[in-house]
Structures are given as C-alpha cells and as structure tokens.
Amino acid sequence: MMKIWENVKYGLPVEGVRIIDAHGHCGDYSEFYNPRKGSPETIVQLLDNMGVECCILSPNIGFKTDHVRGNLMMAEAVAKFPGRIYGYICLNPIYMEDMVSEIKKYENNPGFKGIKFHISINKTPFISPKYEPAFEYANEKGMTILMHTYGADALASLAPAADKYKNIKFIAAHSEVGIETPEKIAAVVNSRDNFYVDTALAGASEGSIETLVKYVDHKKILYGTDIAFYSPNFTFGRICMADIDDEIKLDILGRNAARLFNI
C-alpha cells in the first residue's frame, strides 16, 4: 500500500482518507482579485478535484459589510450542497446587540458547525467585552468558535477566553504564522482541552507543519486551507508531503475535525 506522500507525488487519489477542510471562505472579497469569485459551485469543484469530503466556510461579505446577509447566503449554500459545504455563523462584535439573535437563527441548522469572528477586519481585540454576549451563549450551548488569529501573540491573547468559557471549543486560525515561537503556541494549546489550531496559511515556511506537530498535540490540529481565498492545493500538498507519520496526517486531514464537528 502506497503512503500518502507517494500518492500525491504521482498525482494519484488519496483513497480511503477522510479529508475535511475546516477553514474556508465563499463569495467575493474586496481586497484582492479572485477570478472565480469563490462561488459554492467553484468550491465543490475544487473539493472534487482533490478528493476532499467537505469544507466549513464563512461568508466574506459577513466580515466586511453585512453579517446578516452573509449568513443568509451561507444558509443557501449549505442547503444546495448538503454534506459538502457546511457553514460558520459569521458575527461582528461591532454589532454586539445582534449576535445572540443571529446565533439562534442558525444554531439548529445541521449545516452550520460553529461561529466565526475575524479580529483583523472588525478591529476588536479578544479582550473586548463586545464578545461577551456571544461567548456566554456559545458557552451555554457548547459551541465551536473559529477565531482569526495571526501570530503567536494573537493566539495567546485568546487563552483567557478559553479559560473563562470552558464549554466553547476555540480554534485559533493560521497557527503557523507564529511558528518561530512554537513553544508559545504549544503552551497555550496543549494545556487546554478546549483549544485547537488550524493550518490555513497561504505562504507557510518550509518545515512549518513538521515543527507544529513536534510541539503541538497533533489531535488539536485541524486541516484548513483558506479555500477559496487561495488555492487549497498548497496546504493539501505540504501536509501530505510532510515528514510526519501517516497516522498523524490522517488525524490532521480529517479525523480531528470529524470528532470536533461530529461530521
């Protein structure tokens, strides 16, 4: 039986492997050109090309201008492609009075798997009290929240929230941005049962996956690609070709997300 890296090297399907992309985006975005617009149809085509089972997306318009409209668009996508596209409920802490009502609209929809906040776009640090209504409700319901973090310091700044709201499963995105200080990442993630990271990153350094796995519990690492901001082939390839055991790759590529999101 060929190893995962051998299949990828020769352009063969990675058969019998569950691949779940836990961090993606859909729709137009104002800050850079996306020739295929990140439509749900395009994303499913990309999943099919790579043998990916499903992905969990957030609507770009939800961060930039209109979270209510963005969530409606996401609901349409998950209804059109059940089992292939799942969604995050996109929230904006600037509109803190709307957050709980937005969660309630979609929390019982099986197509939605959690909540997404984007700190860089919404310019609201994790210590802000504006997050509290959503955090308190999500903690009561035991929900999962994907938080945009960029660098080890940003990741570490999420730790107090994870300590306070222990029923929330927090995912810190783009964990390899802080790979130059892997001990700092590991200290936060490995000591908290409710803290995870993902691999979404467009320009990772060579060896960053191996370094992440060396320091961070691989059961806490989720496969994410930023589809369709960027081509998912890059992150898929660097995980499949990484110098780590195939069992670890299987956990990162899909088994960890399957457990966390009950997919």
Name the predicted role of every residue range.
Residues 1-22, 37-54, 218-220, 233-263:
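Mid-to-C-terminal alpha-helical segments outside catalytic/metal-binding sites
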Residues 23, 47, 74, 106, ...:
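Conserved, mostly hydrophobic/aromatic
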Residues 23-29, 148, 174:
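Histidine-centered divalent metal-coordination motifs
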Residues 26-38:
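Acidic/histidine-rich helix-loop elements
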Residues 40-44, 71-78, 100-104, 135, ...:
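Generic structural signal for well-ordered alpha-helices
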Residues 53-54, 62-144, 191:
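Active-site gating/metal-coordination segments in enzymes
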Residues 110-114, 124-222:
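Catalytic pocket-lining loop regions of alpha/beta-barrel enzymes
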